Each structure stands twice: as structure tokens, then as C-alpha cells.
Amino acid sequence: MDDDNGLELSLGLSLGGSSGKAKARDAPLEPKAEPQVEESSSKGGLQTPDAPSGKFYQKSADNHEQNSKQRHSPVAPQFGNFWGQPGNSSGPVVDGSVEPVSHQPQLSSYQDGRMPINSGNNSEEQKPVSGNHKLPSEEMNFQKKHQTASDQPDAFSKSSDGGAKNAPISISTDDGSTGENEDVAESEAEGSNSWLVAQREDSAKGSVVNKGTDRKRSADAAADGFKGKRQPSFSGSESSSGKLTPGNLISMQASNVVALPYQVPGQVSGPPVLTNAPNFHPVCTVQLRPPTNGGLAVQTMGSASQVAFGYPAVQLPTLETGSSWAFGAPPQALSSFTAKDKADQTGTKQVDDGKKPREAGASSSAHAEDEKKADRGLSLMGSAIRPGIAPNVKFGGSGSYPDLPWVSTIGAGPNGRTISGVTYKFGRNEVKIVCACHGTHMSPEEFMRHASADAPAQDNSATLPAFPAGNQATSAEN
């Protein structure tokens, strides 16, 4: 491709691909080297043998200058060679070299060892061409770099484990500065790594939030269990986050749990209903948990109720509305044994309380029996002793007392008379009589003999004075 000035703008210009055209256009430049050699040979005859060596040094210097210019000239690698893969299309050949550009190393540092040493004519021909076309080739190289950079795939290829691998990127510029591109790649890699770290942190936060919500759900389920609700079953995949395994239904129990060494009946009688007890506290219900794995049954009760240990039955006593303790405190769960014990205690108390009236009754009955015996003794006496005071009785002492238990008898025989006396209880089954005429204490038999046989002796006795008949009337009036 040629522009208006006839300059070639192909990629192979910097590598010497168009050497034929350069020779045709720059042919007048070749005779310049020959006059210099002739002048140097004409200056001295001794220098003619050294002319070939001087020409050789001049050519080697020209080649060194050419190599330095080619080193600084921009090289536009193909896309296949950029990624380290050999290109399929044949590139331009450098100065008759058999190897194409694609098979030659792309780095400029390796080009010096493999560049062939060309003749002086080729070096002289490429000098003005490389000098004149340096600026357009740099512009094209800059455009090519932007195109290849835009056509390149992402430098970060995701590996199988989710990480990011950095592709080896080294873009050589005309001044040999590859560090900027590498810095850009490293900054992009750091940005992608930070993005991955942020994604992992977000996922970790999400898992923490999920665990927190799972714990909250389990706490809510526990709170629902205390209310008596049935717990739902969870899938097995959720067991790792603190949830329940499938098929396990757990009813939350109360705090006071007592293991009993016997089977407790599943049904418990409900609390008694009180119609006239508005201020009475509700009775604590008894919950029974069925035995698990063939173990012991567990009885759970509220904290307000007492637990009876070691007894088979759990009963609630019936309440009496008229009792004094019915409205004071809530009833307690009692076993049959404790209820029986209390019944025995109350029975013994009743027996103890009943002993006192029995004793009192026994004493009264004994007194009644004594009275009956006394009456029986009086009845045995027959009609000889009668209650009351005889009309012609003679009193000794200060007078008579009509409120006393008076008795009277009539003596038998020719000397018999009517005497009176006061009875009193001398012993448990014994009654004595005090005669009014002498004041002598005697038994009923003695009292009867005194009335019949002792009448003459009474007249002769000085201890018992005789009272006139007028005293009887006064005593009767009193």
C-alpha cells in the first residue's frame, strides 16, 4: 500500500520486507560508499592493503546502527503470536529469510542474535527508509495496539474452583515499557479479587442472617410448645442449621419434671368445678408425657403444685365450699396414700376428741348408775323408806332443809316410830342417810333399825334433845 509520496506503509517495512523497492528508489545512494574507499586508498599507498578491513569495519558499524534502529522500531505482532500460538497465515519475510515473521521471536531482545548480517548496501538502503517512515509506523502501531486490546478476551478466566486466573499479558511498546500494562492487569486482577471477596462476604452474611432467622424460628417454636401447640416437622436438609430432624414431634414440657418408677395412667381427672368460688385460683393441670424408648413415664406439673413421690395414683381432692380453707389457697395434688394418711389422722383426732365426751358421758352414766343403784337400794327397802319428810318428825339441830333429798321410814314393832333423814352419796355405789333426830350417818338398813329398835334409847340419850311438836309446823312452813 502506497501513499501520495510513494512511501510503503506495510507492516513488514520495519523488518525489511520491501527491500526490492527500496533498492530501486534509493539507487543513487550507493555510489557514496565507493568514493570514500577510493579517497582513503589514494591518501596513502600503505593503506590500500587495509581497505578491505576498513570497509568491513564500516559495514559492521552500519549493521550495528541498523540493528539499533530496528530494535527501537515498533513491531506489530499478530493476534496468534501475541497469545503464544503460532500463526497459520504466512507473514512477511525479513530480508530473504526463510522463516516468516510469525515463527520468529516477538521480543526485541531476542532479535539481535538471529538477525542476519546483511551487506552494506542493504543497510544504507534501509537507513533513509526507516528514518522517513518511523512516524507513520508508530501511529499504525498505536492503532493496532488499541484494536488488539479491544479484540482480546478477558484477561481473567474463571477456573473450575471458582477462582480467577490471570492470563500472561505483556504488550511491548516502541520504547520497551511493558510495566504499565502489567500494572493495569494487576490492578484489574485486584479489583476482580476484591469483588469476589465482597461476594463471599455477602454470602457469609446471608448465611449468618439465615442462621439467625433459623434460631429465631426455633425459639418461636419453643414458645409455641409451651402453649401446648403441636410442633411442625422439618426436612432433613435443614437439620444442619439447628432445626429438627424429620418425624420428631416434640411437645415442650414444664420445668418441674419428675421421673416415676411406674406407669402413670394417661388420663387424669379434671379440676373440680366451684360454682360459688369467684376468687378461687384455677387448679393446676397435670400433664403426662408418654414413655419414650421403653423408658419410664414422666409426670410434669406446674410450679404452684406439689409433687408426691413414689405413689401410683395422682388425684385431686374434692373441695367443700363450706370449709374454711377452700378459699384461702389452691388445692394440692395428693396421692391416695397421703389422702388416706390424712384421713387416718383426722380419724384419730376424732377419736381423741370423742374420748372426752365419752368420758363425760361415762361419768354421767356412772352417776346415773349410782343413782339407779341407790334407787334400786331404796326399792329393795320396799315401802320402808320413802322420799319426803314425815309429818311428825323431830329435827335436831337448827332446823330442816326442805331442798335436800329427804327420806322417811316407819319402824316396825311395838316400839316403831317414823323418822326422817337426808340421803347423800358416800361412794360410787353407796348411799348413806343422816337421821334428823340424832344426826347419825348410817346406811339405809341401819336407818330402818334405828326407827324400830332404838326408840327407847333415843329418849334416854342426852345428845339428841327432843323437839316439841310445834317445830314440825314451822319446819313445814319453811
From Swiss-Prot:
Predominant location: nucleus
GO BP, one annotated term: negative regulation of DNA-templated transcription
Region (Disordered): 1-247, 336-374, 454-478
Composition bias type Acidic residues, residue spans: 180-189
UniProt keyword Nucleus present: yes
Compartment(s): Nucleus
Compositional bias segments (type: Basic and acidic residues): 23-35, 339-359
Record keywords: Nucleus
One Gene Ontology CC term in the entry: nucleus
Ranges annotated as biased composition (Low complexity): 233-242
Similarity comment: family membership: Belongs to the Ninja family.
Name assigned to this protein: Ninja-family protein 7
